[in-house]
Amino acid sequence: DAVEPVATELQHVQLMLGAKWYGTYLGSYKTPAREDDPRPLPKNFYHAQQDWLEARQSGKPWSWSALRPHGVWGFSTGSAMNLLTGIACYGAISKELGLPLRWPGNTGFFGRLYQFIDVDLLARAMMWTATTPAAANNAFNITNGDLFRWQDVWPRIGDFFDMPIADPQPIAISAQMDDKSALWEGMVERHGLQPYALEQIVNWRYLDMALNNDIDQMSSLTKIFQAGWTEVWDSEATITRQLQKLRDNKIIP
């Protein structure tokens, strides 16, 4: 309503959705999830957003596209839903306490298939869908393009922190970390970190939710590849690179 009257040369509207479209928050869902899979009950706000935009575009000279990423990770502070930053802080605190690196989530999920997308790759996909005719008026799944299991990448995270790996130990992370603010303040001083309070960096309750399911999470990228998208990033290498960026920017030691 606000844009159309003033943007007389409007060409494209980009909608950012997510795998919640498929009901990931409801429990087990069909995998690999395809863009044309039946919607779950109940409908969620992603469905309402796309339906509204699609109807609004009908007969207009501009186009729309929607991306459905899953697990968007990238360098940031103050993000309430940044899983890797939370894991990085958990690892750093465990090391400060002289503990091995233990998987803190559901033991079943430790071996499940998982996926995510680097935020830099997501930005590239947004540009691609906005400027590619074959992508106009379509919704696409988007991830790094590969899959992994936490049990396979966990040793790489241990190597990054120079920590031994111990058996998984499911915990309520938020309950265990709620009293670590003073410890983090000391770490900031000792290691010369950016002067952020722990609660400014990580939302432990989000980690509780994200790491405590027991389902494969997998999206089909067939549709976007057939439309011409070609980029695939190695998720294990991306994890190490993002951890290093947190260290380089003095967020973690």
Residue ranges, per PLM feature:
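Conserved loop-to-helix N-cap of the C-terminal "lid" that shapes the substrate pocket in Rossmann-like
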Residues: A66, F110-A123, A139, W150
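Conserved beta-loop-beta element that borders a ligand/cofactor-binding pocket
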Residues: M16-L17, W52-M81
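Mid/C-terminal beta-alpha module of Rossmann-like enzyme folds, strongest
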Residues: A123-D208, N212, S220-T222, Q226, ...
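Glycine/proline-rich active-site loop of Rossmann-fold NAD(P)-dependent oxidoreductases
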Residues: K60, V72-Y90, D120, W128-F140, ...
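Short-chain dehydrogenase/reductase
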Residues: T31-P32, R39-D51, G71, A80-T85, ...
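A conserved pocket-lining segment of Rossmann-fold NAD(P)-dependent short-chain dehydrogenase/reductase
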Residues: C89-I117
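Conserved Rossmann-fold NAD(P)-dependent oxidoreductase catalytic core, especially the SDR/UDP-sugar
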Residues: D1-F45, S65
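A structural motif corresponding to the C-terminal end of an alpha-helix
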Residues: A2-Q11, Q49-S63, A227
